């Protein structure tokens, strides 16, 4: 089982190579391209009996990322590789994506960046004399400057938190004596020459700038520590989901490449949209104790909603139920909530297919679009968190006895809802009246086009 927890920039390997380029002691180090013939010869091997093309491709894809992992671990002082290893019997759906392998490596690399920041701590008290005397040591091997630039590159590529990635990138580009910080992590370049030629005043200015950088690094470190802690908890949850649901959970991995949600969250959302939504919601709505599997799904979904931000604009979705729902007893203008998760759809046709008792039009901003994870992509599902407060703007029965309801997420406030004419802006087509037909339904349904049927 391979768990992806972080979504990263594809330039990670390049950045790490750049962080390590320069000189090794007195020897200049450069990248030398390996001849293609040698590469082919090195990669040639007899495939074990029964090993198919997909498995061999998977092993080839993961090899460079494992090599990066080894290199980074040695640089930052970690001698034991605990990262995921390619499995002989891994499922092709999981093992065939280079993106997944990269994310697995970055997941393991992020904790290592904390060790790099530890090694850089001496920069906070570095003196101008120490800079002149120790620059070669600081900028090579596991020296403070080298470790800092490498750790920041790892955070920029490996953090799942956008603010941390941005801050790490800004620090790498910070001008130290007129030279970007990331260039101070090598010897033999412009930074080395500057230290040799600098006046005592300029060296003091450089160390003052490094002191300021380290004060900002301390704040960044706190954010990374918090993220690493969350990653550890997420891995435990992901392992629990896989242990409980097996392949039914694993099949959802990789369904949200580049998304904000972790493996555990994606698996939990996927399992919910599959066959587990009914039992989980029934237990939540009836106040029953959740079983072990339901607790895992609920935990993962709750984490997903905590991480998700609100949409920039109000989203209109539709919901249908075969009977009543949690808002039956809520009067117009009042606020209520569903104790379970609230599934809605961007497609009104989906609401009609479910709606033999109640059809609702829902306006909100906090829903999660799970269509990319769900097996039923045509449902275009937007999922709201359990106990999301909704204000009932309209509730009336049509001539078929179906309750038509308009819900507005209560958190939107007065300026986003009915006071701005939201009801009148509904664009759902209503059926034309036939001559002589008695209209029993609430006149507001016809005026505002709320007839979905």
From Swiss-Prot:
Where exactly is the site Arginine finger?
146
Disulphide bridges: none
Locations listed in the record: Secreted
The UniProt keyword set, sorted, is: Glycosyltransferase, GTPase activation, Nucleotidyltransferase, Secreted, Toxin, Transferase, Virulence
Going by the entry's taxonomy, the superkingdom of the source organism is recorded as Bacteria
**Keyword Glycosyltransferase appears in the UniProt entry:** yes
- The catalytic activity of this protein is classed by the Enzyme Commission as 2.4.2.31
Group of enzyme by EC: transferase
**UniProt-reported outcome of changing residue 146 to K:** Complete loss of ability to activate the GTPase activity of host RhoA
Would I find Glycosyltransferase among this entry's keywords?
A: yes
Question: Entry's CDD domains?
Answer: ToxGAP
Q: Which residues form the Bacterial Rho-GAP domain?
A: 96-229
- What terms describe the molecular function in GO for this protein? GTPase activator activity; NAD+-protein-arginine ADP-ribosyltransferase activity; nucleotidyltransferase activity; toxin activity
Pfam families assigned to the protein according to its UniProt record, in alphabetical order = ADPrib_exo_Tox, YopE
Where would I find the TR mART core domain in this sequence?
239-414
Query: Which residues constitute the catalytic centre?
Result: 319, 343, 381
Known catalytic reactions: L-arginyl-[protein] + NAD(+) = N(omega)-(ADP-D-ribosyl)-L-arginyl-[protein] + nicotinamide + H(+)
Q: GO cellular component annotations, sorted alphabetically?
A: extracellular region
Q: What does this protein do?
A: Bifunctional effector protein that is secreted and delivered by the type III secretion system into eukaryotic target cells. ADP-ribosylates several eukaryotic proteins including ezrin/radixin/moesin (ERM), cyclophilin A and several members of the Ras superfamily. Host Ras ADP-ribosylation blocks its activation by its guanine nucleotide exchange factor, thereby interfering with Ras-mediated signal transduction.
Name this protein carries in UniProt: Secreted exoenzyme S
Biological source species = Pseudomonas aeruginosa (strain ATCC 15692 / DSM 22644 / CIP 104116 / JCM 14847 / LMG 12228 / 1C / PRS 101 / PAO1)
Q: Which lineage ranks, top first, belong to the organism behind this chain?
A: Bacteria, Pseudomonadati, Pseudomonadota, Gammaproteobacteria, Pseudomonadales
């Amino acid at each position: 089982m391979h768990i992806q927890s972080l979504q990263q920039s594809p330039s990670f390997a390049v950045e790490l190579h750049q962080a390590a380029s320069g000189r090794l002691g007195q020897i200049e180090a450069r990248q030398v391209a390996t001849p293609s013939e040698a590469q082919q010869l090195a990669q040639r091997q007899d495939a074990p009996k029964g090993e198919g093309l997909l498995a061999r491709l998977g092993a080839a894809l993961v090899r460079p990322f494992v090599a990066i992992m080894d290199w980074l671990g040695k640089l930052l002082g970690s001698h034991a590789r605990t990262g995921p290893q390619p499995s002989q019997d891994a499922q092709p759906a999981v093992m065939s994506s280079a993106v997944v392998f990269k994310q697995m490596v970055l997941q393991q690399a992020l904790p290592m960046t904390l060790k790099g920041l530890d090694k850089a701590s001496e920069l906070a008290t570095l003196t101008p004399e120490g800079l002149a005397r120790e620059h070669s040591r600081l900028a090579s091997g596991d020296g403070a400057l080298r470790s800092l630039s490498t750790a920041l590159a790892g955070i920029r590529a490996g953090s799942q938190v956008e603010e941390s990635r941005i801050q790490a990138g800004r620090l790498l580009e910070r001008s130290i004596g007129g030279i970007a910080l990331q260039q101070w992590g090598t010897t033999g370049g412009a930074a080395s020459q500057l230290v040799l030629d600098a006046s005592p005043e300029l060296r003091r200015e450089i160390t003052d700038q490094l002191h300021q950088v380290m004060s900002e690094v301390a704040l960044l470190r706190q954010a990374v520590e918090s993220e690493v802690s969350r990653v550890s908890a997420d891995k435990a949850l992901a392992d629990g989901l896989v242990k409980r649901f097996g392949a039914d959970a694993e099949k959802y991995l990789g369904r949200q490449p580049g998304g904000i949600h972790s493996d555990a969250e994606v698996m939990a959302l996927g399992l919910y949209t599959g066959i587990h939504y009914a039992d989980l919601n029934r237990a939540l709505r009836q106040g029953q104790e959740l079983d072990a599997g339901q607790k895992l799904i609920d935990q993962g979904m709750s984490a997903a909603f905590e991480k998700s931000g609100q949409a920039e604009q109000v989203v209109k979705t539709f919901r249908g139920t075969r009977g009543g729902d949690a808002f039956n007893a809520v009067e117009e203008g009042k606020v209520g909530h569903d104790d379970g998760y609230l599934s809605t759809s961007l497609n009104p046709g989906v609401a009609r297919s479910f709606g033999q008792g109640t059809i609702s039009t829902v306006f909100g901003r906090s829903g999660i679009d799970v269509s990319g994870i769900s097996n039923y992509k045509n449902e275009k599902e937007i999922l709201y968190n359990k106990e999301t407060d909704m204000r009932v703007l309209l509730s009336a029965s049509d001539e078929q006895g179906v309750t038509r309801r308009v819900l507005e997420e209560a958190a939107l406030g007065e300026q986003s809802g009915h006071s701005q004419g939201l009801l009148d802006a509904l664009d759902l087509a209503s059926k034309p009246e036939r001559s002589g037909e008695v209209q029993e339904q609430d006149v507001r349904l016809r005026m505002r086009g709320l007839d979905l049927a």
